[in-house]
Each structure stands twice: as C-alpha cells, then as structure tokens.
Amino acid sequence: MLQNGNEGMSTIPGFSQIQFEGFCRFINQGLTEEFHKFQKIEDRDQEIEFQLFVETYQLVEPLITERDAVYESLTYSSELYVPAVLIWKTGRNMQEQTVFIGNIPIMNSFGTSIVNGIYRIVINQIVQSPGIYYRSELEHNGVSVYTSTIISDWGGRSELEIDRKARIWARVSRKQKISILVLSSAMGSNIREILDNVCYPEIFLSFPNDKEKKKIGSKENAILEFYQQFACVGGDPVFSESLCKELQKKFFQQRCELGKIGRQNLNRRLNLDIPQNNTFLLPRDLLAAVDHLIGMKLGMGTLDDMSHLKNKRIRSVADLLQDQFGLALVRLENTVRGTICGAIRHKLIPTPQNLVTSTSLTTTYESFFGLHPLSQVLDRTNPLTQIVHGRKWSYLGPGGLTGRTASFRIRDIHPSHYGRICPIDTSEGINVGLMGSLAIHVKVGYWGSIESPFYGLSERSKEAQMVYLSPNRDEYYMVAAGNSLALNRDIQEQQVVPARYRQEFLTIAWEEIHLRSIFPFQYFSIGASLIPFIEHNDANRALMSSNMQRQAVPLSRSEKCIVGTGLEGQTALDSGVSVIAECKGKIIYTDTQKIFLSSNGDTLSIPLVMYQRSNKNTCMNQKTQVQRGKYIKKGQILAGGAATAGGELALGKNVLVAYMPWEGYNFEDAVLISERLVYKDIYTSFHIRKYEIQTHVTSQGPERITKEIPHLEARLLRNLDRNGIVMLGSWIETGDILVGKLTPQTASESSYAPEDRLLRAILGIQVSTSKETSLRLPIGGRGRVIDVRWIHRRGVSNSNPERIRVYISQKREIKVGDKVAGRHGNKGIISKILSRQDMPYLQDGTPVDMVFNPLGVPSRMNVGQIFECSLGLAGDLLKKHYRIGPFDERYEQEASRKLVFSELYEASKKTKNPWVFEPEYPGKSRIFDGRTGDLFEQPVLIGKSYILKLIHQVDDKIHGRSSGHYALVTQQPLRGRAKQGGQRVGEMEVWALEGFGVAHILQEMLTYKSDHIRARQEVLGAMIIGATVPNPESAPESFRLLVRELRSLSLELNHFLVSEKNFQMDRKEA
C-alpha cells in the first residue's frame, strides 16, 4: 500500500535538523545548480572568452574558530575557489587559474551563522507554491465567475477567467486583460493548432469577431496586439526584434517561468506529461488550463483550497542562500564583462585572477544576513529560545504577505496543519497566524513540502511501518487519532476510532484505518510540548505559555521540574548548550574553563563557556558535571549549560504555592512572594551588559585612549589602568568612566590663551584642544567588570576603527515589579515581598513561597496548573519526578484527576500526613495565617508549581527624569527611557488631577515640567539661589505653536482685554 523509506526511526528527530539539512542541500546541490547557470562571457568582438569550471569548485575550511569570530566581530565563513579559464580565440591561447570567488558564511553547531560576530539565523518562509489554482467568486448579481491563477516561480501571477458571455480572457495584471486567443498566438500557436488541442473548440470559435480574427491571423500581429495592451502604449507599434526581447523580458521571464516545482504541480493538476526540465509555460499548458477552466464552468472538476498546505511550500535556508548566490553570480558576470572591456580598451592583458573579485559574493551575503527580513538575530534568552527560533516559519517577507493585508482565512488553522504546523504556538498581535512553529516531527521535503510521519498499517498483518507523507498524499488515507495514539502497540484497539479523511474528522471502524499517528506530541511545537496537562488548558493560555517559556531567564541555580512531559532532555541536548562527550575515555583534569579527556592515547582539551553574554543580556555559562579520574562513555554529558540540570531543560524553580487572596496584594494577577526567595537566591540571575566605544581618525588627528583627562574628578577615574581602560574585577557605579578618550578639535580664535596666540603668531603653530568623549556607565548599569576586549583594526584602513568593549555583570535578585509566570499562561507581577514569618504556612509549619489569585483560574480556563500544582506536591513528598504526555484521557476517562489523587493519597500514607489528601476537599488543605496563627476559614489549594522568572524585569523598565532633552518643535520632553524622556500627562490624567483639586501640581505639570521655556529657566535660577518659585505669566510653547499653525492657515488669533471702567479694548497679541 505504502512505500516505506524511513524505517528505524525510534526517537524524535533532532530539533535543529531542518536547518542542518537545508544548509547541506545548499552546499551540495544549490551551488552546483547556480554555477551551471553561469554562462560564458565574451567581449564585444568575441575575441576573448571567460568561463568557470564549476564541477571542481572547492570550499576551504574556515580560517578562524567560532569563538574567535564572536570575540573579534568577524564572519565565520569559508573561502570559495573555482577553476577559471581565459581563452584568446585569435591566437588560440588559453590561461587557466584557480580564482577566489568570495566568502560564504558557514553554519555552526547551533544551526546558525556568525556574521560580524553576531549569531544570525534564517527562518523558514511559507509561500504559495508555483502552479495553477482554480477558484470561483460570486458577483453582485449572484453569478459565479470561474478563474484560474498561474503563479510563476518568481511570484508573478497571471489569471484566466470566463465572463458571463462565455468569453475567455487572460489577465496579466490587475488592469489589463487580453483575449486568450491573442495570448496563445503570441506564444507561437496558430488558430488551427489551438482548435486541434482543446476539448471545447466550439467555445473558442464562438467569441472572436472579425477584428479579433485579424489580430490572431499571424504571430506578428498577435505579438503587436499583446504588446500594445500589456505595455499600455498608444499608436501603432511596429514589429521588431527589440520589441520581442522587451516582451520576453517583462512578461514571459517573470510571469511564465514555473521552475521545477511549478512544472511538477502543473503536470499533476492538468494531467500533462511535459518533461521536468521544461520549466517555462508552454502554449500546451495554457490550452490545457483553459480546458480545465471550461470544465469547471460546466460543473466538472474540483476547486482548489488556497489555504491547504499542499498548495504551499517552504523556502528554507537552502532556497534563500541559493537565491543570493545566483544574484552574486549575476553581479560577478557583469563585473567580469566590464573588466574585460576595460582591459581591451586600455590594451592590457587580463588574467582570470585579475578579472574576478570577491566583492560581489561577500557583499551580497553580508547584505542578506544584515538586511533581509528573514535573517534575524538569534534570540538566546535561554536554550529553548535558541532551538525554537530555528524552527519558526513565517508568511511574511519578500514574496510573502504583510501583516496588514493578510486575511483572517490565511491566519486561521487548517485541517492540513495536522502534524505539520503547531496550532498553538504563534505570535500575538498583528502577526497572529502569520508566524509560528513547526511540529516536532516535521521534515522538509526536497520540493519544499512539509512532511509528517505516520505509521502505515499493512493490509495483511496490520504491522506499523513508518512513512513520511506530504500534505497532498495523506488526505487520501484514513488517519487514526484518539485512542489509537496509545504508545503501547499491544493494547487491543477498539472497534470504532476517530479518524481524519479528506480534511474531515470522522468515526470509522478500525479495519478501515490506513495510517495512525506515531506520537502524542506529533501535532505540537517544542514550546507547546513542554506544557504538562496542556489538554486541560484553553488554547489562548497555552499560546501565552509557549511564548513565555522563551522569555524565561536562566537562574544561577537551575532545578528541573517535578512535573514534565518528557521532552526536556532532548530539548536541552539539541540546544547545544551542554558539552557532550564525542568519544569514551578518562577525565584527567577539570576546572571552570576546560576539561582534559584522555581517549585512545590522545589528550583532548574541551573548552567551556564562562560568563558569555547573550543578545538579551542573559548569562550563558557551563558547569562541569564530571569528576577527575572518572571514566565516561560516548554521549555522556561533561558539562551542563545555562538553564539545564541533570541533562534536562530547567527554566524555573519548584516552589510551594497557594491559591488564596491575601490583603489585596494578589489583585489582578499580582503575586505575593516570601523573602526566602530573595535571601536564598532561589530566583537570582546574572545579567551581562556590553558597553562599546570606538576610536576614529578625525581631520584634526586620531582620538586617544588615555587616563590623563583634565577637569575630571579623581573618583571618576579611580578604576582606570594606565592605558585609560577600566580594570578587570572593578565594581562600577553609575557615572563612572569605563574608557577615557580624548577627541582632538581646533579651538576658536577667542578661546586661545594669550601665550597660545603668541606661539601661533610667531611660529605658526596650530594649537589644538581636546574634547573629552569618554565612555561612561549609564543609569542602572552598576556591576562588576568581567571582561575587557580591545579589538584592533585589521590592516591600515581608517574605515575600520579600533573598538573597546567592556562587559559588566549584574546580580539581580527577584524584587517587586519583576514578572513571573507558570507553564499554563498564569503570569503576574511581584506586588510585595513578605517576611517568612508572615506568610501563610502549612500544617507541618512550612511557609508558602508564593500566593496566587484563585480568581485567575476559572475565567482563564487553564486548569492544567491545578493538576501540576497538586501532582508537584505529591512528587516533592515522594521524591519522584513525573513525565506525562498530553491527552492521557485516551486511556480512560478522568485519567489526569485519578493520577493526581492517587499520588496525593500515596504521599499522605507514606509521610503520615493526613492533610496532604483529605477526602472532603481533595487537593486542598487548611492552612494558617502567619501573622496571627489562626486558621483560614476555607481550605486552600496548595502544591508545588514550576514557576519561571521572565526577562521583563523592573530594573530594565523603571525610569525617572530629573532633566533631559526637549523636542525642538513643541519644546516638550522627549518620550522613552532611552532618551531620558518624561511621562506624558494626557487629557484623562489632567481630569484626574482636577478631580483632586491639586491646582499647583497641575500648573507645574503643564508649565514648568512641560513646554514653558521662560518658566523653566526661572525655576532653575530660583532653586539655585533658594528664592520663591515664580508663577508663569506668558503662554506655554504649545499654545504658541497652535497660533503659528493657525497663521499658516491664514487665521489670526488674538485676545482682547476689556476695562470695566471705560469699556476700552486693549488689544494684545497672543
């Protein structure tokens, strides 16, 4: 029934496999395909010929390591060499050399590329697959109009449609449409060939009139008519060779090149047998498409679902890199042709190495990785973030959709997404449904199809054989779900099972099943697969949890979860943050920086990552997990990375939580925590910030790094060494100088001292002064200096400045304002840190660590946190760890609840604590108020939950403005923390202040602290001398701006003062 080409896969495929396979396909096949498109280059007189021998190209191993590339801000790339030959046809001489084409960035062990010292990743793009698609639309009068859309390999679209008069038109753009007969004739078919190759010749003969028959009488007339309508030119154009070339370039190459994928889809849809290497639209294709369209009009055939994954394909890293390589070769071809012409003009003898430059390829890839929307900076907040980023897909980008034009139908979940695209994990906001994650078992096929594995059941023995199926194949089979997902194949299957067939969900007999799903997590992404009891959560909360797990900060002391799903180990392994033994051997030495391993008589040095900064300022560190003298096996973990524990992903901590109100401090999702989490460093994390300064060569001379900076206090320079750079290990406070720098500048004539003017007048010496441009530590950046890097420029070019980078580590304990979250979308802000003795405590005297709002559970419908909380308590008491797959109700009803209650009952018996499981209110317990020692009135749900500390921390968000910059036009303070901006007092805030009657505060907000220029200056002077702050008398700048705006509209705004005594009007201008 099914061909099995994927036997033997017993584990989940590597999570970074898609990136690796894509890059290998680019190196092995993509380069060769683009090289074969490189044509011979000749001069105008055809005397010199240049060509490349593309069969023997060579990629050299990178000259630097990944660590050096990151450290020195270089690109981790490989040099590409190709043999080239230059032939002089007149003298029959030939010169062959190996030329350097350029550098190609190489993928590293994380599945990413290092460009200019930055980890970058290319995400997958889902685009409409080239081919032909049929659809119908209702007009305003209720008549159906059938159209077919031909999508080229470059994204160009051409439409065929039948109007109400049964006339067939080809629409090459939104405005122009042309008769199908004219288009067919312009493509080379005459009227007799058209009528002989269609199924409905009477329809073709019915609509052309005498004028149209004249247009299609010859190919030249058809081309002229088509060109006149397509290019929208007036008059009567004359047929010429240049006109044909222009039409070929503008229309046929852009809109009629199908590519290999488009040719395959067109043959399959129209039942054609045209060879695969014929990648352009032929007249035969056009006539077959019209026949099919007429059949649709007559009620035959099926319409296409544009949202189905069989009509889409993935542009992976292989396709994107191959497109850029082809673009670079086109630029190289133009450069070589221009160089040959220049050499002949100047009567020089060129060589292949002189003709070829590496600029085209190098700059093309640097531009792609730096500017392309699908090339993104790798998010390295934690290991999960790294690995999920490489499995993202997007409808956005060049050739795709935009967030504002994408319809709801495109964003919605489609039945063909089953097992291929995660229905949970997607972006929030304007890009919802346009970006998401691939399911964990997905494989990208050769043609860009998203393939998912199934167990194919043979007709005789019903034995399972694993097969990968594309979306256009599995809809023809009955795919079982539900109870058939049991991992134990020996379980007797029921007679009737739920199944999926042709995008419909049915209930059929087991004997009719063709395929069955292979794993309970098959249809989820990595983020969603790490949520225990996800089947008990609302999908919106599961989406939030998938996104928030990627925002978790690695803690100083990692702890793996008590309740998990079983994928934590592979996630940590595939992320690459842990060090894995590549061979067996004996550990002979370990420290914090390296491990020495003796294997087969050789000693291997394995370096470890120490306090490396991620682009989210989190700390990536590796800790040794093996001891000296121990023997290890291949694949054993030598050192654990950040946010890992025991080889498993460990993003948070197991803490004792209670769901109860407490004095309003957990109102609206606020969280009350114990001070134990602070002084025991349970949620302490390290953050590393980078500060950089560059030295340039100015017109007045080079900038200098020095400690000798005049007119500065000595305390600001106390941490600098003799070179003017901060010393390692120094404790730095806000405002301290990290790097001392002086920039030379020429002073004005009036600022010279008398002796300087004398030297200048007598000796002509130009006296220069220096401006202090040192690197200072900004507000909120206090910490310990852990690394200083002085990166010198390579070569003598002044465009490459020297850079000095200072890395400062901060130790952040959890505090009020930090954001915490569980794995079920239950998030909140720390509202108060309570002393340990005031926290509610259990019947055995254990104080609670966190108090959550119980009202956050029923309305959000994320009941999975209740199961995790209770099972976590049982696991903590029994010293167990649970790994539970989703949808355990496939075994029996209420399986989750039975498991939790049985474990709580066992924990109650084993620990002899009856309060752990009380039949009257299972899962709940009577706890005491820490302040009074009294019992709370109602039993409270308590347990151990796995809570994460997120990257949204109050230290990065808190901000206060004392003075700062003002906008030039409105003279109001700027907005934003980065600009030392202020907080806007809007209309509703003014109402609030008016409601309290605080007139003086309101006046300050609208004048001194806003845009009253004169009042600001007077307030500053009064504060310095200690005088009374004067009241503002004139209008603020915003009012003056309004007056100027009205004047620009020829409207004059004045006000008049009327005296009560003599009723005279004194006019004063605003």
From Swiss-Prot:
Subunit structure, as described in the record: In plastids the minimal PEP RNA polymerase catalytic core is composed of four subunits: alpha, beta, beta', and beta''. When a (nuclear-encoded) sigma factor is associated with the core the holoenzyme is formed, which can initiate transcription.
EC number(s) stated in the UniProt entry for this protein: 2.7.7.6
Reaction catalyzed: RNA(n) + a ribonucleoside 5'-triphosphate = RNA(n+1) + diphosphate
Lineage of source species: Eukaryota, Viridiplantae, Streptophyta, Embryophyta, Tracheophyta
PROSITE patterns (alphabetical): RNA_POL_BETA
Localization per Swiss-Prot or TrEMBL: Plastid, Chloroplast
Function: DNA-dependent RNA polymerase catalyzes the transcription of DNA into RNA using the four ribonucleoside triphosphates as substrates.
Disulfide bonds: none
GO terms under biological process: DNA-templated transcription
Species of origin: Phalaenopsis aphrodite subsp. formosana
Record-given protein name: DNA-directed RNA polymerase subunit beta
Keyword terms: Chloroplast, DNA-directed RNA polymerase, Nucleotidyltransferase, Plastid, Transcription, Transferase
Superkingdom: Eukaryota
Any one GO molecular function term: DNA-directed RNA polymerase activity
Family classification: Belongs to the RNA polymerase beta chain family.
